[in-house]
Every structure is written in structure tokens, then in C-alpha cells.
């Protein structure tokens, strides 16, 4: 909620308070009116000095006139003085003073002041954090039709922040704000309809709200709508439209849109493959600290592409940045690079990264960690632990791990030798993605089995395929059904 609240803290000098027209008054006339004690003129003169309009910019003079108007109880000036203390413009930043002046204006019903006072209580700036008090002021601003207040009320109910969480109420307040063009609220409504929060799930309506935000130029709306076109959710799948929207968001600096645009360009999903342009966008995302951008940049350097030479040093550098942020795939790939380099010290680094990724369920890392333990490279040889990690990878459907686990059972490495288990895992790998090693090893192992053991192995394999190779299992069932139809038609 903090991010959204910061977006609705009202900080601008103009267009926030409506001032009675002073007519076409020049600076000297304005000074005369201000010196005579006219509060409106004092505030306007403060504006002139603040912006350097018809005079030299002078923040000290501006603050003096703002204060004179505010001390007369002129509500717009009280609010403006609060802004100046909040921003530290013309005076040292002083949140406590900002709260004092905001409260004076808020108590007189100025919605902008009520909104900002609510934020001060929410963030604990100049006062102790008091979420209930913040909601009180947000509500007052919202009930006067202030879209920022309505958004903040939506946020409060969405997060359960100062009120009991209530998605229905959140949707109602977001709707009020969104109807006034509040883009954050449009995005929140898009999210709520996509998840069925406080409303029946409706991806088409979700897309409509994201579109409203995107059309207004909001980078998040563009990002979310691009995602919907990419996956074909709520709209017809359209990679070209997705690329356009990702590009619009990326140009505004959105790091997620930047790496996703890079991926579309690298894969050629909306035209010819453009790895060089992809590299540029990955780098923009990566340099903002986005772990996905760092991963994709590293991966492109790792494998290379037309116009992009392989660069191991760059790959290691960017994989490391992503890995240090906890990206499991980057950790696994970084470990793989170190393992290939060959020295004992590099093998140790590899094992460290394999362990981090494997603990998060990354199957390639589990497989590689199992192999390192089997070979005793970078770690003390431990066949029992190797078998444990290899099984974890095999049970996630990695056919190479299924073959390796079969070999572990075939040779009795860290487990009791079991040809039935070995055959079942080899057959699972063979069926999974037509792994040739699985097929060859299965045929070799079959010679070790009795007829009864082969039946047991076949039954066990069926269970493994159904559980650990579901796509292969679905293909098998489809073929069986087709075969049954053909047989029935004869």
C-alpha cells in the first residue's frame, strides 16, 4: 500500500486549491493588495516569488507571504504552507509543522489537506503511525469526491490497513476513483477481476480496466495489458499487440516490461528474431536491478546468438547479480558454468550455488548437485545424498535425472541394488521424452529381470510415468483411446 499512497500524496503547487480570481493584476498591484492584508493576494504573491513569475525566484519571500496568508486562517494558504514544510522548500523540511498546517486546513474541509494528512498518519511522518486515523482522513477526502482519497480507501480495504480487509468495499472505492480516471485504481480493478477478489472473476473486464489505464499512458496498465495479450487471457492472443504495449511501458522505464520486450525480440514472437535489440532491453532492465533482466542478459551472453558473441565473463557477472537476489535458475546456471571450468575451487563455488537453487526446488540444480555428490567434485563424495537429490530431480520430470537415478539403482550407489527400480526409471525416462540412454539402459537391465520382476517393473513404471511424466502419460492414454476406436471399427 505504501507505494500507492506515495503516488497520491498531493505535492503540486497549482491546480490543487481553487483560488478566487484576482483579475489581471500586475506584480506591483499584487504587492499593494498583499501589504494591505488581503490573504488571497498574499498567497498569490507567494506563488509569484515561488515560481519567479514577473520577479526573481525567491523561496524565502514566498514562504513569508504564504505564512502571512496562512496565519490569517486562509485555508488554501494553510495547505500550501503544509506542502512547503513537507517538501522542505523555502524552509528546512519539518513534518511536524506540515502536520500542524495540514490539520488546520483539513478541519475546515479542504480535501487535498485531508488526503495528505491521512498519508502523514499512515507513514508516521510528523506524528506516530496511526492507521485508523489515516483512514478517517482518507474517508473525508473520498466522500468529497477526491479520487486520491477514494483510491486510498480502496487501498485500505484491499490491504486491511486501518480497517478490516474487505475486497467488496475495496472494489467499490476503486470503482469511484477509476471512473474519475485514477490509473492506480484502474489497475487494481483489473487485478481484482483477474483474481476474483470481491467480484466474480472476469478476465474480459479485467482487460478493459487495464486498457483504460494503458490508454492513459500508465506504464503498469500497459504492462498488464501486454501480459494479457501475450498469454491470450481476456483477449485474443496477439504477440504483436503485446510487443507494442511492452514497448510503451519499457520506454517509460518499467524494468519488467523491458525484459519481457527483450524476450519477445530474442525469440522472434512478433517478427524476425532480434537478439541485439533484445540484449539492449535486457541490459536496461538488468541495470535497474531487475533479477529477471539480469538472468536473461546473462543467459544471452552464456549461449550467444546471431550478432551476440558468447561472453563467459559477462554471463558470470550478470548470473551472479541475479543469483544473489535469489533467482534459482540463475543460481543453477551460475553453478553449471563454474562446474564446467574444472578447478577444485570452481567446483566448490558450483556446489554452493547448486545447493541454494536445489533447496528452492530447481530441478537442474538438484540433478547437478546429485552428480557432484556422486563424483565427489567440489564436495565430499556422498552416494546416499546423491541418490536423494537425484530422486528429487527425477520426480520433477527431468529425464536425465530419471536415467541417472536408474543407474544409481542398477549399480547400488547409496541405495540397495534394485533392478526393478532401475528398469522402471529407465523406462520412465525413455517414455518421458524418448531419452535414448533411458531406452538403451532399460533394454540392458531387462536381461537381469525374471518374468515376474519385469511385470513388477512395468507396473511401477506406469505409476512413475503417470506421476512424474504427466505429458507422456497423456500421450499414452490418447494413443490407447485411438487404438481402441480403430479396433472397434474393424
UniProtKB/Swiss-Prot annotation:
Keywords in alphabetical order: Magnesium, Metal-binding, Repeat, Signal, Virulence
Biotechnology: Immunizes 1/3 of injected mice against subsequent infection with E.coli strain CFT073, suggesting it might be a good vaccine candidate for ExPEC (extraintestinal pathogenic E.coli) strains.
Cellular-component GO terms for this entry: cell surface
Stretches forming Sel1-like repeats: 39-74, 77-109, 111-145, 153-182, 185-218, 222-254, 256-290, 291-327, 328-361, 364-397, 399-430
CC cofactor note: The physiological metal is unknown.
SUPFAM superfamilies linked to this entry: HCP-like
Main localization, broad class: other
Pfam family, one: Sel1
Cofactor: Mg(2+)
Binding site for Mg(2+): 122, 159, 161
Compartments reported by the entry: Cell surface
Upregulating conditions: More highly transcribed in logarithmic than stationary phase. Protein is not detected in bacteria growing in culture but is detected upon infection of mice (at protein level).
Highest taxon, organism lineage: Bacteria
Gene3D superfamilies in UniProt: Tetratricopeptide repeat domain (1.25.40.10)
GO molecular function, one term: IgA binding
Signal peptide: 1-23
GO biological process, one term: negative regulation of neutrophil activation
Other comments on record: Preferentially encoded in ExPEC strains (extraintestinal pathogenic E.coli).
Self-association and partners: Interacts with human secreted IgA (SIgA) at least via resides 244-260.
Name under which the protein is recorded: Secretory immunoglobulin A-binding protein EsiB
Species in which this protein is naturally found: Escherichia coli O6:H1 (strain CFT073 / ATCC 700928 / UPEC)
Gene for this chain: esiB
Amino acid at each position: 500500500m505504501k507505494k500507492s499512497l506515495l503516488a497520491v500524496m498531493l505535492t503540486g503547487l497549482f491546480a490543487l486549491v481553487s483560488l478566487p480570481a484576482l483579475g489581471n493584476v500586475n506584480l506591483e498591484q499584487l504587492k499593494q493588495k498583499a501589504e494591505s492584508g488581503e490573504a488571497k493576494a498574499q498567497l498569490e504573491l507567494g506563488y509569484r516569488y515561488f515560481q519567479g513569475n514577473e520577479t526573481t525566484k525567491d523561496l524565502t519571500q514566498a514562504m513569508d507571504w504564504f505564512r502571512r496568508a496562512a496565519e490569517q486562517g486562509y485555508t488554501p494558504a494553510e495547505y500550501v504552507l503544509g506542502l512547503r514544510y513537507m517538501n522542505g522548500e523555502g524552509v528546512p523540511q519539518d513534518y511536524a509543522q506540515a502536520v500542524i498546517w495540514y490539520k488546520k486546513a483539513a478541519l475546515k474541509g479542504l480535501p487535498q489537506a485531508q488526503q495528505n494528512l491521512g498519508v502523514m498518519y499512515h507513514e508516521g511522518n510528523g506524528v506516530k503511525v496511526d492507521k485508523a486515523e489515516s483512514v478517517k482522513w482518507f474517508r473525508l477526502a473520498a466522500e468529497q469526491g477526491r479520487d486520491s482519497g477514494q483510491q486510498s480507501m480502496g487501498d485500505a480495504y484491499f490491504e486491511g490497513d486501518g480497517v478490516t480487509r474487505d475486497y467488496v468495499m475495496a472494489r467499490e472505492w476503486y470503482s469511484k476513483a477509476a471512473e474519475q480516471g485514477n490509473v492506480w485504481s484502474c489497475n487494481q480493478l483489473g487485478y481484482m477481476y483477474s483474481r476474483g477478489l470481491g467480484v466474480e472473476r472476469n478476465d474480459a473486464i479485467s482487460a478493459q480496466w487495464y486498457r483504460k489505464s494503458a490508454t492513459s499512458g500508465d506504464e503498469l496498465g500497459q504492462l498488464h495489458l501486454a501480459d494479457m495479450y501475450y498469454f491470450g487471457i481476456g483477449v485474443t492472443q496477439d504477440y504483436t499487440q503485446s510487443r507494442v504495449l511492452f514497448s510503451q511501458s519499457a520506454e517509460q522505464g518499467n524494468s519488467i516490461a523491458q525484459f519481457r520486450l527483450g524476450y519477445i525480440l530474442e525469440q522472434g514472437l512478433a517478427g524476425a528474431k532480434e537478439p541485439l535489440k533484445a540484449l539492449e532491453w535486457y541490459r536496461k532492465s538488468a541495470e535497474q536491478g531487475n533479477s529477471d533482466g539480469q538472468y536473461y542478459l546473462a543467459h544471452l551472453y552464456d549461449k550467444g546468438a546471431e550478432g551476440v558473441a558468447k561472453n563467459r565473463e559477462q554471463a558470470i557477472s550478470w548470473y551472479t547479480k541475479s543469483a544473489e537476489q535469489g533467482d534459482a535458475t540463475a543460481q543453477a546456471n551460475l553453478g553449471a558454468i563454474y562446474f564446467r571450468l574444472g578447478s577444485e575451487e570452481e567446483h566448490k563455488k558450483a556446489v554452493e550455488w547448486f545447493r541454494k537453487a536445489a533447496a528452492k526446488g530447481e530441478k537442474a540444480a538438484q540433478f547437478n548437485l546429485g552428480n557432484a555428490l556422486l563424483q565427489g567434485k567440489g564436495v565430499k563424495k556422498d552416494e546416499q545424498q546423491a541418490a536423494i537429490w537425484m530422486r528429487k530431480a527425477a520426480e520433477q520430470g527431468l529425464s536425465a535425472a530419471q536415467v541417472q537415478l536408474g543407474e544409481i539403482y542398477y549399480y547400488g550407489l547409496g541405495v540397495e541394488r534394485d533392478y526393478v527400480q532401475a528398469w522402471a526409471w529407465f523406462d520412465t525416462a525413455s517414455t518421458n521424452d524418448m531419452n535414448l540412454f533411458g531406452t538403451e539402459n532399460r533394454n540392458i537391465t531387462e536381461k537381469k529381470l525374471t518374468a515376474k520382476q519385469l511385470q513388477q517393473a512395468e507396473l511401477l513404471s506406469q505409476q512413475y510415468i503417470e506421476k512424474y511424466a504427466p505429458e507422456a502419460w497423456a500421450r499414452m492414454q490418447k494413443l490407447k483411446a485411438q487404438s481402441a476406436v480403430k479396433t472397434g471399427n474393424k
